């Protein structure tokens, strides 16, 4: 079968999506005697499609190139977040019509991956210099699936914190390498009939391909954090469209923000914070960190 021939080709070190030629002779035995035929045959194996060098869990995948934020310096390449076996994702800024590539080191061998004219993810063979481009500059979420040899691009627009009570919005700036943030942020909470001391539920919103999605907590109704709460409290999970806006929300930490006196029906934090969203591989998951502004500057 073709699959059996492909397996033989792999043993012969033939690369995927190439042709390889195997030569053969017949060796005959009779007791202790043996003879090798003078005639030689050969057959060509058409190797199946695929990626030869699949990175393991401990072999990171990066995006690099003139079209990326590292300007072609592989030492500054942005690591992609491993989502699952063979699946990697990154949020990054790309330049229109400028080349980039995906790379990894697999069993000590530097490997590069690109997308062909048919949109198929492939591994570059020795001597090849294929790259990837996008037609429009912008911030993208890029997801590659090496097992299925696919790639997807999502254009990212505004990113902001959103208080459900009062509909208050705080926009974030793109900081580079998959990070968004705001400095000297003054948190606020608004009183409600069920929350006389103020409703603090909030989440983060992101425009993806023109549609606004929420990023929230993994639990539907998580309680309020304090100063000893583990940082994983603010790990970010993309929520399905149509999810109730109050569910899977975060809550502010009263001990950190130290609310002032009520002004009208709103409380304002007396401690300003620097808030950073990490949509990259820095912490092994997408997450948010809040620091008092003075501490963040130190």
Predicted regions, residues:
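A short, hydrophobic C-terminal helix/tail in secreted or cell-surface proteins
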Residues: 294-298
